[in-house]
C-alpha cells in the first residue's frame, strides 16, 4: 500500500504538502499539486479511511436508523436525497441495526462501534428504549417527523400538504 510519506519522498516535498495537494487545498502551487497527484495515480495510491479517521477524529460515516421497507415510496426518496447529499459532502451512509454479524448490540452501541459522526433517525419505533437511548446519547442526532429533546428535528407539515393537495385536485375540476 502506497503512503503519503512515499509520495512525499518521490516528489521531494513534505507529507503535509502531499496531503494538502490530495485534498485540493488552495495553498499548494498548482503545478506541484498536479505533479503530486500524477505520482499518486501512477503508484496506485488509495486514501486510507482508517488513517484519515485517526488524524481528523472523524469517520465521514453517517448512520441511518430506518425500520420500514426501503421500497417505501416517500422514505425511498428521502433516503436517496440523504445519500446524494452525503456523497456530495464526502460522507458514506451506513444503516444502523441491532446487530453486527451474530453479535447483538443496541442502536447506540452499533453507531458508536462504527464511529458514526452522526445518526439520522427516521421511520423508527420512537418509543423503543434503544431508539430513546440513541437519541439521548452524545452523538449528533437528526430525527425526521418526531421530536426528541436535545435533538434536531425535521418535521413535515402534513396538514398544510393535505390542504395543498385538496386545492390542487379541486382546481383540476375533480
What do these predicted regions represent?
Residues 2, 61-167, 171:
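Alpha-helical recognition/docking segments in bacterial nutrient-uptake
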Amino acid at each position: 500500500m502506497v503512503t503519503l510519506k512515499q509520495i512525499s519522498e518521490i516528489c521531494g516535498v513534505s507529507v503535509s504538502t502531499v496531503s494538502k495537494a490530495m485534498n485540493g487545498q488552495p495553498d499548494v502551487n498548482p503545478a506541484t499539486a498536479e505533479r503530486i497527484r500524477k505520482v499518486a495515480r501512477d503508484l496506485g495510491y488509495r486514501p486510507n479511511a482508517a488513517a484519515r479517521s485517526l488524524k481528523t477524529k472523524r469517520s465521514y460515516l453517517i448512520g441511518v436508523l430506518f425500520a420500514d421497507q426501503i421500497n417505501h415510496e416517500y422514505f425511498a426518496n428521502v433516503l436517496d436525497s440523504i445519500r446524494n447529499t452525503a456523497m456530495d459532502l464526502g460522507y458514506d451512509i451506513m444503516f444502523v441495526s441491532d446487530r453486527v454479524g451474530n453479535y447483538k448490540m443496541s442502536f447506540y452501541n452499533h453507531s458508536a462501534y462504527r464511529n458514526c459522526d452522526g445518526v439520522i433517525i427516521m421511520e423508527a419505533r420512537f418509543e423503543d428504549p434503544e431508539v430513546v437511548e440513541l437519541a439521548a446519547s452524545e452523538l449528533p442526532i437528526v430525527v425526521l417527523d418526531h421530536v426528541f429533546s436535545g435533538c434536531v428535528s425535521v418535521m413535515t407539515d402534513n396538514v398544510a400538504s393535505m390542504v395543498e393537495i385538496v386545492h390542487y385536485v379541486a382546481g383540476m375540476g375533480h
